[in-house]
Amino acid sequence: MGHRVLVYVGALFLILFTIFPSSSALISSPDANPPYPKAISDLKESIVKGLGFQSEEVKVSGFDIRDALVGHSVSYEFDLEIDNKVLPFKLLEDVNRWEYVDLPIFQVEQPSENGLVPMRNKKTSSDDVLPVLAPFQLSGPMELWIQDANNMRLSLPYDVDAGVLKKVILADGAVVTVKGARSVSLRHPIDLPLPLNQSSNEFASGLLSLAEQLRRASTDQESPVLSLRIVGPTSLASTSQSPDNKLKLKRLAPGLVELSSMSKDKRSLSTIGANAMTTVLTPREFTTMWPITSINGSNANLLGFEKLLTSVLGPKAQEKGSFKVLKAKVAAQTFMKIGFGIEKKLKEADVEGLSFPEWRTKPETMRMHFEVLAKVDGENVIPENVMRVDPIPLEDTIAQNVITGNVTMSKLPIIESPPSPFTL
């Protein structure tokens, strides 16, 4: 008897395990409804609110990270004060190439089978995907405040171990090449005199004259020296590899050094890019712009900035006076381009003002397609521009009987074409 009971109990457990093989089978597969990454989810909510929709009214589709395009560009931000009015400007270079890149913010942590999120031993670093500015040259006198550059290399032209640098003072005549910087910004506002001495349309002569006056003011002991903040540089190097043109290092304090030129009278020319040539404006004066001596007056961006400044100043550009630069920042940015769609149910009030033919069914839902250009800032994605797109153009096809009013061919008027000598 006891043996039969054990057989029945064993058979019952076998049936139960066959029907319910595991408790995890009651949990829906994560691949069936893949969750959005937190950055994309926050981006979706901010865009829906920015468009004026409520989350309950619309159905949002898209935002598939597999279709996201990633590109790098350079942004320019300026705040000018003219006649006690602050005018902010934000310019962005065109992205040359869009790619499918799996950024760290696109990754979603999936819970394990026991429902617990695995603990990460080390946070994934995104330094490998951070964009950097092209190498550029800076000339003294000025001071550089270094940020996020613990492993910065100092070459004068030979490598020098100066520890972790926080501040570098460039003496008059010292020129260094900065590589790997993520952004460069102005630390203090500066006053620039007017008028703009514009003499040629092929050169940014107005900005060059402003830069020259600013350089002369920086050499004055009574005027404050120009101060810049550089984020994330990987190296500061002498522009010349010759030992006769090397820079002299002077340690002033922990994290503070001064670089001065051994041959102050000699001008170091730009060596960035084999095709780059320095344009001579006069036999004795080069058109390189201080303090960024790696660009000259024929630079396309510099010409664009001068035209923008001239249009903003208006008649004041030719009058005596001054204006302030409160903020100036140049940064390498990562941008993302992704598409999405919004579907909204229409009410009677939404369709009343629209005229539809009698044969056409009035729409019940409205579908709109958008494309968003967003900036990747650390772990966040900030929308910059949302543009509506029409992926498929709509065309109305009307039957012939609808156009002719359902009239038979026998009742249509006979129209004879004019005779032609080539007709048989």
Curated annotation (Swiss-Prot):
One term under GO cellular component: endoplasmic reticulum
The stretch of residues making up the signal peptide is 1-25
UniProt key word Endoplasmic reticulum: yes
What name goes with this protein?
Answer: Protein TUNICAMYCIN INDUCED 1
> GO:BP terms for this protein?
endoplasmic reticulum unfolded protein response; pollen development; pollen wall assembly
**Compartment annotation:** Endoplasmic reticulum
User: Any phenotype upon disruption?
Assistant: Normal growth in standard conditions, but altered pollen surface structure with pollen grains adhering to each other.
Recorded source organism is Arabidopsis thaliana
Q: What does this protein do?
A: Involved in the regulation of pollen surface morphology, probably by modulating the secretion of proteins and/or lipids during pollen development.
Keyword Cell inner membrane (UniProt)? no
According to the lineage, what is the superkingdom?
A: Eukaryota
Q: Which UniProt keywords apply?
A: Endoplasmic reticulum, Glycoprotein, Signal, Unfolded protein response
